[in-house]
Amino acid sequence: MQSQEVQVIPVQQQDYQQWIPYWLAYQDFYKVCLPTKVTETTWQRFFDKAEPVYCAVAKQGDKVLGFVHYVIHRSTWAETNYCYLEDLYVSPETRGQHIGKRLIEYVQKQAIAQQCNRLYWHTQETNHTAQKLYNWVAEKPGIIEYRMPL
């Protein structure tokens, strides 16, 4: 297994059984529990060509090692679209092997291919492990996010 190369590819329907435990672990990390309907809708959007919501997985052979979700959207600050990297998760057993970096680079390539002006993402200020990776691959613009429940 270790000799097989890790590939980052668009998620496929047959990846669901491996994706779902990671998706739930990701929610646990952020102390949220999304309704099942949200998860089902999200999964369906990945395969709907009319939706600008995407998922890619890092795989070694048939084993999923992590995922990235991203959204292409309009901006009032540019004529071209932006790409928002919404979720990134790598299995704890394979962290430190540059899989997160490879998932980000995959999204970067997709954003360039779709002529996006910017790739951006958020993380918890206490997620220092992820910030080490993010500081390595991108710049921190000093933006503070505010949320208003609707």
Give each language-model segment a name.
Residues 45-57, 84:
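A short helix-loop-beta-strand connector motif used in the catalytic cores of GNAT acetyltransferases and
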Residues 20-45:
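Conserved GNAT-fold acetyl-CoA-binding loop/helix
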Residues 94, 98-106:
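Conserved acetyl-CoA pyrophosphate-binding loop and the N-cap/start of the following alpha-helix
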Residues 57, 63-72:
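Conserved beta-strand in the GNAT
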Residues 6-21:
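A short beta-loop-alpha structural element at the N-terminal edge
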Residues 101, 125-144, 148:
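Conserved active-site alpha-helix within GNAT-family acetyltransferase domains
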Residues 112-122:
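Conserved GNAT acetyl-CoA-binding A-motif
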Residues 73-85, 95, 142:
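A conserved beta-turn-beta hairpin within the catalytic core of GNAT-like acetyltransferases
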